[in-house]
Structures are given as structure tokens and as C-alpha cells.
Amino acid sequence: QAFQDMYLEVPEEGFHNEISGGFEIRKAQLSDVEEMVVLEKRISGIERAKDFKYFIENKRGIWNTLVCRDTNGTLLGFLGSVDHPASQMIGPGVGESEKVALCMLASLLDRFRGKCPVFLFPVTAKEAVQTAYSWGARNCEIHFSQCLGKNQPPKGIVMPTFMPETG
């Protein structure tokens, strides 16, 4: 799968482009990890509970992870980010749809006030990519995923990253 690496300069006053979807977006908790693992396994075929716990525990104070649920409480996606002087990046995450991914991205972008984080969308996520462009995002690179063994095509939106991942 090919991914568009994009960056967006977030204004000092914040990012205020919310996507309406009737979703609840909140900070992830350790109690969400099991559902996050199940969702990512279904969407992308990998499991990394250890990473999710590390991000949510946030002992270094640089990680932020959100979950997105529907009105029934079903987990539809999650998205993490790192905000450190050496790396300002959004991901990893997965979403059931482009709309879910965009809602989580919009929420995380506001936490990067006055900064310029990088995030990745699959090149096939046309609505998400076009929406990011409309917000002022720009391309910086293209990346390709690879795997050993049999490939499992994603069953949703995957937003990878270059952070410490065990997947």
C-alpha cells in the first residue's frame, strides 16, 4: 500500500476544522487497549498491545492517543501522536472509514498549535487526502508498506508512523 506523507502548519490559535459525524472522540485509556488491538487486527492484520499501553501511559509526556466511538460505544478508530522537539508526528492509527480518520485527525491537529506535524494517509483515501489539502496540508513524501509472508489488504483506513512500533 502507498501512503502520502503530509504536513500541516497549525496556527497558533489552533485548528478549528471539525468534521461532524456524531462520534465521541476522547483521550484513550488503558481500558481501551484490548478493543484497540482487536480493531487494528481486523483492519490491518497486526497486533501491538505493548505499543498502545506505552503510548497511553505516556511516561515521557510526549504521546497523545485518542479513540473514536459511535453513539452506541463501539470503537471505530484510534489515533496516536508524538509531540517532541525531534519529532512531531500523528499516528499510528486506524479507522473504520475516512470520516472517522478525519475526525480524529482534526482533533489531534488542534493539539499542535503553532507546530507542523506530519501524518500519513493511504493514497487511495481520496476524501481524506482532499480534505487535508483543503485544510492547507502539503505533500512531503510517499511511503510504501511491505510485509513478510501473505499480505492482508486493509479493511479500513490505516495511518502508520515511524514511531517505536512492534507491529
Where would I find each of the regions flagged by the language model?
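Short active-site oxyanion
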Residues: 24, 114-118
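Active-site/acyl-donor-binding loops of N-acyltransferases
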Residues: 1-16, 82, 92-94, 118-167
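Amide-forming acyltransferase catalytic core, primarily the GNAT-like/NAT-type
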Residues: 1-89, 99
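Residue-level signal for alpha-helical context at structural boundaries
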Residues: 54-58, 108, 123-126
